[in-house]
């Protein structure tokens, strides 16, 4: 029987991680764990509770009763926080622009890292985020680091937003993505860095199918 692998896909904002991770998981019949949605869900709960987003102690208390569920659905899995469906609301600009601050808090990273490791324990998982290959699943058999130019990533985010009825100017998105890159790669705990044993894939010139095929080839090589 082929061993069920842990597959870590990391990279900056809008590099195509979740789109690619979902497709790879589907091809392999693996579970997909969207760690970005987990941090967004905590950000949503904190904003709703009027907690200061850099108050580590208050966030720690919030997480004690924080129930997060992913429910399989088409076209994408649904996300629930304490029984409330938040699938769409956690993708709004208010959450997007605040999630880096919440993600930088030690108690939040510790709590969610533990939850993510529990989900991945049995293998057969594709997990995407910023620190999966370095911190969450350091022993993952396959580690991918996706990159793309700021311009290309802003264009992708712009198209996604338009499809959802959000019209943020392209230059604003470029600025926001560059700022998120800086915050993500300069935070003290689990900054965004490529794991030493990760394979870098530049998605700028590639279609989604081409990226998926490249990753499937890497997985194939590692599995023999």
From Swiss-Prot:
Source domain of life: Bacteria
Chief location bin: cytoplasm
Molecular function GO terms recorded: ATP binding; CMP kinase activity; dCMP kinase activity
UniProt keyword terms in alphabetical order: ATP-binding, Cytoplasm, Kinase, Nucleotide-binding, Transferase
Gene3D superfamilies according to UniProt: P-loop containing nucleotide triphosphate hydrolases
Keyword Membrane set for record: no
Transmembrane intervals: none
Entry GO terms, CC: cytosol
Single GO biological process annotation from the record: pyrimidine nucleotide metabolic process
Amino-acid positions noted as binding ATP in the UniProt annotation, renumbered to this chain: 11-19
InterPro entries linked: Cytidylate_kin, Cytidylate_kinase_dom, P-loop_NTPase
Signal peptide residues on this chain, from the entry's feature table: none
Subcellular location field: Cytoplasm
EC number(s) on file: 2.7.4.25
Enzymatic reactions: CMP + ATP = CDP + ADP; dCMP + ATP = dCDP + ADP
Top enzyme category: transferase
Pfam families associated with the record: Cytidylate_kin
Similarity comment: Belongs to the cytidylate kinase family. Type 1 subfamily.
Stated name of the protein: Cytidylate kinase
Protein species of origin: Ligilactobacillus salivarius (strain UCC118)
Gene that produces this protein: cmk
């Amino acid at each position: 029987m082929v061993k069920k692998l842990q597959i870590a896909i990391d990279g900056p904002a809008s590099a195509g991680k979740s789109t690619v991770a979902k497709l790879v998981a589907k091809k392999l019949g693996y579970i997909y764990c969207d760690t970005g949605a987990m941090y967004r869900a905590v950000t949503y709960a904190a904003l709703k509770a009027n907690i200061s987003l850099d108050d580590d102690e208050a966030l720690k208390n919030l997480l004690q009763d924080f129930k997060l569920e992913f429910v399989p659905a088409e076209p994408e899995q649904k996300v629930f926080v304490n029984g409330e469906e938040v699938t769409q609301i956690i993708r709004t600009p208010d959450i997007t622009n605040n999630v880096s601050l919440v993600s930088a808090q030690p108690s939040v990273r510790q709590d969610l890292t533990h939850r993510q490791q529990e989900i991945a324990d049995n293998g057969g998982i594709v997990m995407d985020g910023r620190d999966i290959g370095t911190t969450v699943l350091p022993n993952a058999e396959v580690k991918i680091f996706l990159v793309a130019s700021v311009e290309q990533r802003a264009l992708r985010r712009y198209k996604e937003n338009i499809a959802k009825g959000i019209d943020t100017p392209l230059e604003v998105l470029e600025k926001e993505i560059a700022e998120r890159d800086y915050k993500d790669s300069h935070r003290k705990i689990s900054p965004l860095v490529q794991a030493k044993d990760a394979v870098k894939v530049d998605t700028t010139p590639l279609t989604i199918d081409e990226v998926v095929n490249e990753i499937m080839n890497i997985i194939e090589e590692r599995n023999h």
